């Protein structure tokens, strides 16, 4: 009965998650398709929310204006990439690392967390902006990445919650299981292959075969799961259930995109190497 109760709760939570994703996904994909300043505004809005949630999770630098400083620097890095270039944007990221570390040191806060924040929050969104800006394959690369990460996230949660296998990392995230990890990564591979095959048919996929899509889907699925586990560790450390409350069934925005934060830079590197 207890196992049945857990399964019903899991399915109920899954229904809320699925409804949230179903409502948001078409809008996000439409914005990716439009690109240009609309996609830039989506990233800019996201980075403001993510910077605020990161400060909530880690305590930030401890300065009275810590949140505002981080938000301004994070937004400034995206604006630098948009108006000037990615080298200039990375200079702003480096400046943000220095400022956050200095403020944390002065307030005797956790300097490594404060310094890592700009890298963790800003670089993935710069990677998404760079990916979308690639000629011909830009839209396909971002759409493929989103579909793979969404697949591993949804099916890891569903499979892990229903099969009740051995715990993956009980001291970090008691709800995560080996079945969820394997199921989520497998579904990421399938999504990568299917999406890759379609994108190849319209010449919008950067890689040459659909089987490469499967292999990369598995790889991105693993990196997304690592990102999910990393955020779970941080929440456990700070004794918080969610990074925020903005998305029903998911908590904060960071809870929804934690896998994307690790997989987007990896995808950008792969596309850069192939290109």
Describe the residue ranges of each PLM region:
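Interfacial loop-to-transmembrane junctions
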Residues: 236-259
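Membrane-embedded alpha-helical bundles of polytopic integral membrane proteins
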Residues: 1-218
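Hydrophobic transmembrane alpha-helical segments of multi-pass transport and channel proteins
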Residues: 218-226, 253-261
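Hydrophobic side chains within alpha-helical segments
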Residues: 20, 56, 156, 231-234, ...
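Re-entrant/interfacial helical elements at transmembrane boundaries that shape
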Residues: 161-162, 234-238, 261, 266
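Juxtamembrane boundary at the C-terminal end of a transmembrane helix
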Residues: 268-275
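Short helical (or helix-break) motifs at transmembrane helix termini and adjacent helical loops
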Residues: 151-161, 224-236
């Amino acid at each position: 009965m207890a196992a049945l109760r857990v399964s019903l709760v899991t399915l109920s939570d899954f229904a809320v998650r699925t409804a949230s994703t179903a409502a948001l996904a078409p809008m996000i994909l439409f914005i990716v398709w439009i690109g240009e300043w609309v996609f830039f505004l989506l990233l800019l809005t996201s980075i403001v929310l993510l910077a605020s949630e990161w400060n909530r999770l880690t305590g930030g630098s401890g300065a009275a204006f810590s949140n505002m400083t981080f938000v301004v620097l994070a937004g400034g890095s995206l604006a630098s990439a948009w108006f000037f270039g990615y080298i200039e944007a990375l200079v702003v990221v480096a400046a943000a690392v220095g400022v956050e570390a200095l403020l944390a040191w002065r307030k005797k806060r956790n300097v490594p967390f404060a310094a890592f924040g700009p890298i963790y929050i800003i670089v993935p969104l710069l990677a998404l902006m760079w990916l979308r800006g690639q000629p011909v394959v830009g839209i396909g690369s971002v759409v493929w990445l989103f579909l793979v990460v969404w697949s591993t996230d949804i099916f890891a949660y569903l499979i892990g919650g229903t099969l009740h296998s051995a715990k993956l990392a009980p001291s970090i995230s008691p709800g995560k299981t080996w079945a969820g990890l394997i199921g989520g990564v497998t579904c990421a591979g399938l999504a990568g292959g299917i999406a890759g095959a379609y994108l190849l048919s319209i010449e919008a996929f950067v890689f040459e075969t659909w089987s490469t899509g499967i292999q990369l889907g598995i790889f991105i699925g693993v990196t997304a799961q690592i990102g999910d586990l990393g955020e779970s560790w941080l929440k456990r450390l700070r004794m918080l259930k969610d990074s925020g409350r903005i998305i029903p069934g998911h908590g904060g925005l960071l809870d929804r995109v934690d896998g994307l934060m690790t997989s987007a830079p990896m995808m950008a590197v792969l596309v850069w190497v192939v290109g």
